[in-house]
Every structure is written in structure tokens, then in C-alpha cells.
């Protein structure tokens, strides 16, 4: 077997390391040599903080890539939220990870690489969100004139919330609900978006009143300080809010993307409070002025109506004047009605007398004699005619009986019987109709008799005068003074004695 000394370099002075030893030596060398460095690069592979709070990503340029990690404590101290593609300057130390022979930078501080890079990123985001319609003026909501509750999204400490509450208390005291958030740093954007969405999910009748308007406020600061309000999640939450939102981020010269998505932008948090509520004293003064104007207008209105009423009352005729013409027309109509009733009664009496003369007993007796003679002649002719008819029908029947079989006869008999039944029913119906017609005619004649009778005249307030023999008195000239008369009214007779007096003229003679 060959000796170990046969291998090249076996007896050299090169030190021998284990894998762990060489990895540890490299780690110490890197950390000692690059204990504190500043690295400029573009963020790549950023997915937000891990569940542990740490963030893992890489910094790259056009020729190399450096793995990076930010521990949870350093992550919470960042003044902006890292985003994919953002160019930053990271401050930290280099180290290696022996388990995979990789080196990385542990970032302690990080800031955007100049305002130009942030502005370029901001402009790109602005154009993209505008193309989606999130800044469309048609989506803007009107602020309520007199809100009941105002929701404020800001830091619970500092001058901003104190200025807002103080200004609201001075102008129009009402309930203010504060949703505390961080207004700077990596978690600023998500917390503001959560607050806006949380206010929108409050029910109208819940234990916490739903605000009528929201104020998202923060004091002034650099572009990096205000970067959380340029976060896309904040812009989308404000644009989707069903509650009107006032943006009051930074000073008047500062602007963020939330200003474009909000329904109203205020130059300062104090200005936002002034936009949200009116001045109570101004409202009271306006109410008093409007009330005075209304009272004055109502007073003038009632004065005008009173004057118009008095003028109308003076122009209106009295009741006697209004009724004079109708009364005259009524009297004339009553007079014409009396004459018309008298004339109509005379005409009906003449017509009735004519019919009565036609129905004299002599004429009726002659008519009855003629009818009896006719009936007697018919009675004499009927037996002979009936016997001849029966002989003829019997002969025809015998002749047909010899020619026909029983079956057709039976069918014809049944058919004839059915026809006879139908004829019977039709006869009964015709008789009923005739009886009804006669009855109606009798009723009409009865009504005519009652109409023509003088008793119907008595029902209308007239009276009939009879002499001592019970005959009606038709003319005043037929009555002598001292004659006993009977006056028949609707409900009975009254005996009277005639005496000399004026003769009432016949009203028909004046026509």
C-alpha cells in the first residue's frame, strides 16, 4: 500500500478547517470588514412583513443582487413603507448565514434614495389609479350640512386632534369619534385604510354611532413622512367610502394621493374642522333673521287678505238682493202652475166624459146581443163541422193505416207526442204572457182612472163642491145665496151655506 507522503502537498504548512470553522471564519471576516455600510439599490421580492414581524427581500442593481433582512424592531422604526421597485439607501451590517453559505445585509435604517425616486414612483401610481377612475369627480360626495357625528382618523396624541376638537367645539359642538392610527411609518397606510373601512362598516343603529363625515388628518412633514398617505390601499379605501371623507394631510403646499381620492381637501386639520361643521352662532343669527322675515311676510300677507276680504264683502250683494230675482221667478212659476193645473184638469175631464159617453149602457147592451148571436151561430155550426172533420180524418187514417207498418206509426206517434208537449208548453207560456200583458194593461188603465178621477185632484190640495142633491157644482152662477153645499176635501166633506160675494174670474179667459 502506498504511503500518504506520496500525495502532493501532504507535508505542506496549509491549515486545515472544518466546514463550520471556515464558515465561522468567513462570517467574522465579513462582519469585521463591513461592520457598518450604506448600500443603494432597488427593492426586489418584497412581500411585506412576515408573521413574525421581520421582512425579507433583496437589494439589486443592474449587475448584482444582495439579500437583505429587517428585524421587527427596525421595521417598526421605518418612516415609510417599503414597496417593490423602490430605490432605497439601506444602512446596516453585512453578515453570512453559515447554513447556506450566503451573505446578506441586516438593515438597521432605510430611506428612499432621494425625492426624485419617490416622485417618479408617486407619479406612476397616480397615473395608474387615475386610469382606474378612483379620482373621478363624478364619484365625489357632498358633505352633510349639519352632521351629527364626525369620525377622525389620526394620531390620538399631538396637536392635530386637539386642534380639530377645539375648532369643532367653538363652531358647532357635536360628538367626535377618534380612530387612533400611526400617521408615519411602515404601518401607517394599512392602519388608515382599516380605520376608514371600519367606520363604513358601523351600523346606523349600533352602540357606536356611524359618522356622517370622516376627517383623515396629519400635520406637515417631508415626502417620506407623508408617504403612508400615498399608499394604494389608503387611496382605494377612501375612494370606496360611503361616508364623505375630508383629507387634511400636511400643510397647504403638501399633497398626497389621498387628497385626490377624498371628497374634499382641506389645507390644514383646522380647516377640515371648519369644512365639516357650520358656525352655530351664524346659524342662530340666520334663523332669527329668516324668522323675522317670515313673520313680516306673514303679517303683510294677512293684511292683504283682510283688505281683499273687506273689499269683497262690500262688493257682495245682500241676501235679499240675491234672492229677489229667484223669488219673483218662483212666484211666476207658481202662478203658471196653478193655471196649467186647472187647464189640464179641464182637458182630462172633457176626455174622460167623451170615453164615458162611448161606454153608455145601450151601446154595451147592443154589443152583447151581437156577441151572443155570433156565439149561437158558431155553436150550431160547430157539431156539423167537427163531425165532417172527424169523418175525413178517420178515412185518411184508415187509408194510411193500411199502407203503413206499425213501426213508423209508433215513431210518428212518439214524435207527435213530443211535438204536442212542446206545443203545450208554448201554449202555457203564451197564456202566461197574455195574462201578464192583460194584467199590465189593467194596471195602466187603473192608474189612468185614478189620474182622471177627481180624487187625485183632491190629493193635490183642491176641493170639489156638491149641491144638496150630491151633484158637482161646475159654475158659480149655479149657486144662489142660502144654498146648502157640501165641500169635499181629501180627508172628508164639510157642509157650507152659500152667501153673496165676488165672482172669481176664470183664469183660462186671460190666456
From Swiss-Prot:
Subunit record text: Heterooligomer composed of large and small subunits.
Family according to the record: Belongs to the XseA family.
UniProt keyword Nuclease present: yes
GO biological process: DNA catabolic process
Keyword Protease: no
Pfam families, A to Z: Exonuc_VII_L, tRNA_anti_2
Keywords: Cytoplasm, Exonuclease, Hydrolase, Nuclease
Localization terms from the record: Cytoplasm
CDD domains the record matches: ExoVII_LU_OBF
Primary role: Bidirectionally degrades single-stranded DNA into large acid-insoluble oligonucleotides, which are then degraded further into small acid-soluble oligonucleotides.
Protein name: Exodeoxyribonuclease 7 large subunit
Upper classification of the organism: Bacteria, Pseudomonadati, Pseudomonadota, Alphaproteobacteria, Hyphomicrobiales
Leading EC class: hydrolase
EC number: 3.1.11.6
Gene from which this protein is expressed: xseA
GO molecular function: exodeoxyribonuclease VII activity; nucleic acid binding
Gene Ontology CC: cytoplasm; exodeoxyribonuclease VII complex
Catalytic activity: Exonucleolytic cleavage in either 5'- to 3'- or 3'- to 5'-direction to yield nucleoside 5'-phosphates
